[in-house]
Amino acid sequence: MGLHFKWPLGAPMLAAIYAMSVVLKMLPALGMACPPKCRCEKLLFYCDSQGFHSVPNATDKGSLGLSLRHNHITALERDQFASFSQLTWLHLDHNQISTVKEDAFQGLYKLKELILSSNKIFYLPNTTFTQLINLQNLDLSFNQLSSLHPELFYGLRKLQTLHLRSNSLRTIPVRLFWDCRSLEFLDLSTNRLRSLARNGFAGLIKLRELHLEHNQLTKINFAHFLRLSSLHTLFLQWNKISNLTCGMEWTWSTLEKLDLTGNEIKAIDLTVFETMPNLKILLMDNNKLNSLDSKILSSLRSLTTVGLSGNLWECSPRVCALASWLGSFQGRWEHSILCHSPDHTQGEDILDAVHGFQLCWNLSTTVTAMATTYRDPTTEYTKISSSSYHVGDKEIPTTAGIAVTTEEHFPEPDNAIFTQRVITGTMALLFSFFFIIFIVFISRKCCPPTLRRIRQCSMIQNHRQLRSQTRLHMSNMSDQGPYSEYEPTHEGPFIIINGYGQCKCQQLPYKECEV
């Protein structure tokens, strides 16, 4: 006996319920309302360049992305996006936004990217980004910000990239980035920064790239970057930096690239680069350096690329340390490194000038072997301590560890070059003469049997030639002489003279035969 269970609803009712469930699931994907003039792709709405003066109200509340780029929006009111809790990215760049009210982005807990660049924002309340706890990318570049509230970025612990380029910032508040523990990229370039606070970058333990180029920085103390324990690249080009110092002993082992191009650097602390043992790229083109101390160069052990062009290099004995280092450098340098002074070397490559004008008599490929003092007939320089130098009879105080760049005048090297060439040529001639004499003497002393054999061979050859000539001459005479036959006896030729020999003669018509 079988049991039969009958479903209380018929087949048509089941089909209707299934269709309704499918429609309900598709409602978010279909989008309830796409704003006019916008292009909608699933839950991503693109309303760029449509002339909007405010955020459209008809936007789907479940959208994941909203782009309002290149419009005419002038202000962001409080709770402007409160109902857009599902947004993951929001692009508001290239508008005319000048005012951002407190809590304008309230409710955007899932937002990961916020682009506000190329607007007219001059002030941001300290609670502007408080609720954006998942924000990873924030772009505030190309605005008119002149200052930042110390708590502006508080709570942004997942922020990875922050763009503040091309504003009017004059200072960086202490501990501004204290809560940005995940930040890896920070761009503060093209502002009006004049100095850096000691704790201005505190908290950035994961920062790898820092841009400070095109500011108004005049002095750099690398101790201010002490907290940047993961920094890989530092850009400081095109500021007004004249001095590089390091206020404390520490090791910045992560830094690999340092760009100081286009500054006014004249002096460098002797220990600056000792704190950067793994520095691979150092660019210092277009500064005001005229020499570099050998201690500075010897600390650049890991470099693969260096840029030193466009400086005021003085091609005198003071450039010997740099020339020696360049001669042994295994990497590459950007552009040519040319002499700036004196006039007769201007425009010459440093290495060509050093060898062509013989500026360095004891040029060594090992920088550490270079002398640390220079003496010439007119001015004497002797380092007596880290805080003073003697110039002649005067003592000049300097900052401890700073390479001195005092201007001095050196005699023209033309006469010395001519004298040296004459002496060198004379010594070469004398050496050649004595060398030849030495070779001859050694040959006579060490190889007499060989000479005797050569002499004997020569004499034997001469005897053979003489004998051959004699035989030829006798043969010619016998053909024309009065004797046609001669038969000597066995006693020898003297018997003929004594009458014991026989001579058979045949008288010729024109001569007589005599016995």
From Swiss-Prot:
Expressed in neuronal tissues. Widely distributed in neuropil regions in discrete puncta throughout the brain (at protein level). Detected in cortex, thalamus, striatum, olfactory bulb, cerebellum and all hippocampal subfields (at protein level). More abundant in deep than in superficial layers of neocortex (at protein level). The keyword Signal applies. Changing R208A: Reduced heparan sulfate binding and reduced induction of presynaptic differentiation. LRR repeats lie at residues 61-83, 84-107, 109-131, 132-155, 156-179, 181-203, 205-227, 229-251, 252-275, 276-299. One of its GO terms (biological process) is positive regulation of synapse assembly. It comes from the Eukaryota. One of its GO terms (molecular function) is neurexin family protein binding. The keyword Membrane applies. This is Leucine-rich repeat transmembrane neuronal protein 2. The gene is Lrrtm2.
